Amino acid sequence: MSNQKALVIFSGGQDSTTCLIQAIQIYGRENVQAITFQYGQRHAVELERARWIAQDLGVKQTVLDLSLMRQITHNALMDDTAAIETAENGVPNTFVDGRNALFLLYAAIYAKGQGIRHIIAGVCETDFSGYPDCRDVFVKSMNVTLNLAMDYDFQIHTPLMYLTKAQTWALADEMGVLDYIREQTHTCYNGIVGGCRECPSCILRERGLAEYLESKKAV
């Protein structure tokens, strides 16, 4: 695949950084770009991490401003004063309606202009937080929609879709970057450097790491 190019939807978190490093290994650094979205997220430190990691890995990064989302939707992920809770339907109030649909749309528009067909997203439905737009059925339908909308053969890849968080840590270890992911990425919804250990994202991350390290010791 060295003659093909890929665009990674990149937040600076554990999953997207794992995907970015994997893409570099598959396609070659010179063939990989990252696209990052500023949408008013309360964990803005994530954006700082994304910029640093992209620069450190030598990957071109494009940052798009989608903060207009604040004008049309409200959720705990974009409101510093809101408590993070889970609704009766099981969906946390950190869910941003339409976020991944918008991310994929804008990523596709950018990718086509760059002659890129491969779009990579770190979404996962195994150990996910109950977000409907992290499901494989959504991504596949979006892939078809974008191909039809732009008459272009996009291929959306979700390498973590069926991996547990423990398996995602294992993948990072296999690529030789477990410590890098552990020390350099940011996942906390509350924007606390090093993690708050209380929000759903921190809990998933820490639980997965503990499970992986425990299984590694048992081998």
Curated annotation (Swiss-Prot):
Q: Which residues are listed for ATP binding in this entry?
A: F10, S11, G12, G13, Q14, D15, S16, T17, T18, C19, L20
Query: What Enzyme Commission number(s) appear in the record?
Result: 6.3.4.20
Cofactor stoichiometry and binding?
Binds 1 zinc ion per subunit.
**CDD domains for this protein:** QueC-like
Disulphide-bridged cysteine pairs: none
Give residues annotated as binding Zn(2+).
C188, C196, C199, C202
Cross-referenced Pfam families = QueC (PF06508)
Pathway(s) where this gene product acts: Purine metabolism; 7-cyano-7-deazaguanine biosynthesis
- Any GO BP: queuosine biosynthetic process
Cofactors, names only: Zn(2+)
> Can you state which reaction this protein catalyses?
7-carboxy-7-deazaguanine + NH4(+) + ATP = 7-cyano-7-deazaguanine + ADP + phosphate + H2O + H(+)
Mind listing the UniProt keywords for this protein, alphabetically? Answer: ATP-binding, Ligase, Metal-binding, Nucleotide-binding, Queuosine biosynthesis, Zinc
Enumerate the GO terms in the molecular function aspect: ATP binding; ligase activity, forming carbon-nitrogen bonds; zinc ion binding
Describe the function of this protein. Catalyzes the ATP-dependent conversion of 7-carboxy-7-deazaguanine (CDG) to 7-cyano-7-deazaguanine (preQ(0)).
What family is this protein classified in?
A: Belongs to the QueC family.
HAMAP family named among the record's database cross-references: QueC (MF_01633)
Q: What is the protein's given name? A: 7-cyano-7-deazaguanine synthase
Please give the organism: Neisseria meningitidis serogroup C / serotype 2a (strain ATCC 700532 / DSM 15464 / FAM18)
